[in-house]
Amino acid sequence: MNDLLNKKCVPCEGGVLPFDISEIHKYQKKVDGWDIIKNEKKIFYLYKKYEFKNFLESQIFINKVGDISENEGHHPDISFGWGYAEIKITTHAIEGLSENDFILAAKIDQIINV
C-alpha cells in the first residue's frame, strides 16, 4: 500500500522551500501515471488526465475529487468535459511541489482503484 494514503495534507502558508528535482522524482515513483510539468512561470505541477465513458462519469469523479480536496484542505486545478477530467496539483503558497501534492494525487487515484 502507498504510504502517502495514510498521511494528511498539512496547511502550507509559505516559508518552506518547494521540492527540488530529486525529491520530485523520488515522490513521483509513489504516484503512478502522474506527469511532472512546468508552467510558463517555471512552477512545477503534477498532471494527470483521466478518461471516462461519458460526461456523467467525469462529473461524478470530479465531485469525489472535490470532497477529498476539501477534506485535505488542498485544492487542485480541475478541468473536465465529456469523457475526461484533467487535474493539476501544486502548492501555490510555495510556487512548487510539496509532499501535500503527492498525498492528494495518491488519494485521487484511490477513487479510480476502489
In which residue ranges do the predicted regions lie?
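Long, contiguous binding/interaction regions
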Residues: 1-56, 60-114
